[in-house]
């Protein structure tokens, strides 16, 4: 129940509200998070997304060492990104680090999702094909938004966050459903 509320309501609404009233194609969460009135909101957004995506969902999906290292690295980089201020005029090196942390966290999350979905797809192509296609669509549309704006924009960050969250809750429900043997085999005593 709490996973559904978080996935279908809290993360999408909070993500949209965080960027509300701003130019979605000229600004990004880094710029918004550096504003005094949005600093705590940015930190809270990072905590919600980090805990939900990387701990509650990916933790329960099939993974081996590669996926574990990738997801933990993404979580650490996300934590670094939301706690490293993006102030290019005052602190250019920290701003540079912030960009590296944020971008790397997203790339590692995407890589982790591909590793997990690919593993499931190889186990049962018919069942997990929609998730593999969905992940490819998320990747292509994210690349298109990046090219359209020329920067990692709020529009891209909103799309990526919400679409990955919604895909993950559906994948999580599929993997943990009784119709799929993976979860029951994994958690047998």
Question: Where are these predicted regions, by residue range?
Answer:
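Hydrophobic cores of alpha-helical transmembrane segments in multi-pass inner/ER membrane proteins
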Residues: 8-14, 41-56, 105-116, 160-175
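Membrane-interfacial loop-to-transmembrane alpha-helix junctions, especially the N-terminal start
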Residues: 1-7, 63-74, 124-135
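Membrane-proximal helix-loop-helix units in multi-pass membrane proteins
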Residues: 76-132
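Physicochemical signature of membrane-embedded alpha-helices that form the seven-helix bundle of GPCRs
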Residues: 3, 7, 45, 73, ...
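Hydrophobic alpha-helical transmembrane segments and adjacent interfacial helices
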Residues: 12-16, 54-57, 75-89, 111-115, ...
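N-terminal topogenic module of multi-pass integral membrane proteins
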Residues: 1-61
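Non-cytosolic membrane-interface motifs at loop->transmembrane helix junctions
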Residues: 30-34, 91-105, 153-163
């Amino acid at each position: 129940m709490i996973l559904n509320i978080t996935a279908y309501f809290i993360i999408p609404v909070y993500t949209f509200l965080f960027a509300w009233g701003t130019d979605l194609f000229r600004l990004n969460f880094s710029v918004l998070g550096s504003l005094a009135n949005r600093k705590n909101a940015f930190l809270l957004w990072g905590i919600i997304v980090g805990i939900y995506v990387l701990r509650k969902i990916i933790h329960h999906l099939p993974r081996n060492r590669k996926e574990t290292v990738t997801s933990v690295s993404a979580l650490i980089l996300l934590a670094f990104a939301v706690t490293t201020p993006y102030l290019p005029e005052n602190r250019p090196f920290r701003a540079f680090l912030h960009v590296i942390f944020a971008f790397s966290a997203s790339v590692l999350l995407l890589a982790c999702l591909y590793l997990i979905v690919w593993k499931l797809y190889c186990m049962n192509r018919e069942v997990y094909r929609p998730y593999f296609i969905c992940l490819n669509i998320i990747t292509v549309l994210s690349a298109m938004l990046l090219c359209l704006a020329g920067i990692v924009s709020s529009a891209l960050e909103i799309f990526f966050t919400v679409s990955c969250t919604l895909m993950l809750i559906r994948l999580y429900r599929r993997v943990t459903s009784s119709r799929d043997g993976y979860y029951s085999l994994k958690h047998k005593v």
